[in-house]
Amino acid sequence: MDFGKFAATYIEELKTVLDGFETNRFIELINALLEAHAQGHRIFIMGNGGSGSTASHFVCDLNKGCCLDLERKFKVMCLNDNLPSVLAYANDISYESVFVEQLKNFFEKGDLVIGISGSGNSENVLQAIRYAGANGGKTAGISGYAGGKLADLVDIPFVARVDDMQKVEDVHMIVVHMIMQAVYAKLHPYNATGKPC
């Protein structure tokens, strides 16, 4: 196998996906995050597998990276990070309910719920999104391929339109880091670089 050729092909394919970047949805997502921050609403983010690690990373970047030195903090929770809770709900109820059951404890009207799913069809993510939408929340989805059910269900759908899970996840992490830097710059107008540590 020619690994150099493989790398070049992978990068070119990723560039093609990024050429179709959904800028308007990206802006909507940033504005929803800033609105939740300004109004003191909670933000819940979740995913499975690689999307779960992206969700966890996203929460860290918002909670620490964007507002460490600000008086008003983000209130962000990753629903896949509390492993004992996830396992308890999965064991005693169903894996499909692991996120929605946590929302029932913490969610309040006006909160923002973000689901990350490569396929857009993860049922546990969809159940949580449905609950949030039915109870006065704002919802966003970050998915891939053609968007899946998630894209049709949320208020703000961002889709990385490529039929390759790894490239979908690549784009999702790029979106997370772009959001972090954009939000940081908005909340730190005195910092000319706009780049968090």
Regions found by a protein language model. Give the residues of each.
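Short, glycine/polar-rich helix-capping loops at beta-to-alpha or helix-loop-helix junctions
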Residues: 142-154
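A charged, well-structured terminal subsegment
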Residues: 105-106, 110, 166-197
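Generic N-terminal amphipathic, Lys/Arg-enriched alpha-helix
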Residues: 1-20
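Short glycine/serine/threonine-rich phosphate/pyrophosphate-binding segments
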Residues: 51-56, 121-128, 150
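Glycine-rich, small/polar surface segments that engage phosphate groups of diverse ligands
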Residues: 35-107
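A short, well-structured juxtamembrane/interface segment
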Residues: 19-39
